[in-house]
UniProtKB/Swiss-Prot annotation:
Molecular function via GO: G protein-coupled receptor activity; olfactory receptor activity
Family from the record: Belongs to the G-protein coupled receptor 1 family.
Record's subcellular location: Cell membrane
Disulphide linkage map: 98-184
Function: Odorant receptor.
Superkingdom of origin: Eukaryota
The protein's name: Olfactory receptor 1B1
Intervals, Extracellular compartment: 1-29, 88-98, 166-201, 270-276
Glycan-bearing residues: 6, 22
Species of the source: Homo sapiens (Human)
């Protein structure tokens, strides 16, 4: 990452994502502070409940606990810095920190999408082969699937970093590179670059699309088989129970993959800065916020564990 050839130092990026917003920075600060604190509180509570209550020591909740940790990481990569910039009114970030944020954002973000796909596989085994569910989706296998998700994600992220490192940027009179976003993401970095970015744009579209093809295919095939299995169930109560176990996961699949496709897998000429901003807020702030509530509000096991924990706290202060 460097300035144009006649520059002698690393670029400093000026994050201008909310500079044109018709909302005061104070209001934005308290809005994102509330989102971040609620995200951390919700996901920490879910992690503690799953770890504490033996009734939640099943493969589904093991994966859900891993997803909650990832969601906290994804929010922490972007939102604390955004809050600091909203307070300072001078949202600069040096090249090294920008690259670090870029790396960790993709590491957590891609892992998030892969774990969501693994959870679809878990639901498939639970509904289509319930007698062997505990054997097939044991904790060791779940741990291996989580580890594999991290390995694939980090390899993908290293490729993205490798595409960004050779790029050059031209600074303004103050030596800053204007970045039309609220954190260091791939497309805004490309738009601000003075290098030829055609190969980068193609890599985002095709390599990223290829990476998402596997998880998307796994999710679709899992739910096709799940749907067929549900239709074969003899009782309406059994069908409702099976559908309820998948409803939360399907909600987050649509939410997460919808925003990712909206930002990263449209042809460059159809992609706008405003569209990137809105979808990125949904992906980095709203999705991690929603996950613990979507998975717990309609889940009797989680609500029961929360009630037992509160009773235990009252009895043993």
């Amino acid at each position: 990452m460097s300035f144009a050839p006649n520059a002698s130092h690393s670029p400093v990026f000026l994050l201008l994502g909310f500079s044109r917003a018709n909302i005061s920075y104070t209001l934005l600060f308290f809005l994102f502070l509330a989102i971040y604190l609620t995200t951390i509180l919700g996901n920490v509570t879910l992690v503690l409940l799953i770890s504490w209550d033996s009734r939640l020591h099943s493969p589904m909740y093991y994966l859900l606990r891993g997803l909650s940790v990832i969601d906290m990481g994804l929010s922490t990569v972007t939102l604390p810095q955004l809050l600091a910039h909203l307070v300072s009114h001078y949202p600069t970030i040096p090249a090294a920190r920008c690259l670090a944020q870029f790396f960790f954002f993709y590491a957590f973000g891609v892992t998030d999408t892969l774990v969501i796909a693994v959870m679809a596989l878990d639901r498939y085994v639970a509904i289509c082969d319930p007698l062997h569910y505990a054997l097939v989706m044991n904790h060791q296998r779940c741990a291996c699937l989580l580890a594999l998700s991290w390995v694939v994600s980090i390899l993908h992220t290293m490729l993205r970093v490798g595409l960004v490192l050779p790029l050059c940027w031209t600074g303004d009179a103050g030596g800053n590179v204007n970045l039309p976003h609220f954190f260091c993401d791939h497309r805004p970095l490309l738009r601000a670059s003075c290098s030829d970015i055609h190969s980068n744009e193609l890599a985002i579209f095709f390599e990223g699309g290829f990476l998402m093809l596997g998880p998307c295919a796994l999710i679709v095939l899992s739910y096709v088989r799940i749907g067929a299995a549900i239709l074969r169930l003899p009782s309406a109560a059994g069908r409702r129970r099976a559908v309820s176990t998948c409803g939360s996961h399907l909600t987050m699949v649509g939410f997460l993959y919808g925003t990712i496709i909206c930002v990263y897998f449209q042809p460059p000429f159809q992609n706008s800065q405003y569209q990137d901003m809105v979808a990125s807020v949904m992906y980095t702030a709203i999705t991690p916020l929603a996950n613990p509530f979507v998975y717990s509000l309609h889940n009797k096991d989680v609500k029961g564990a929360l009630c037992r924990l509160l009773e235990w706290v009252k009895v043993d202060p």
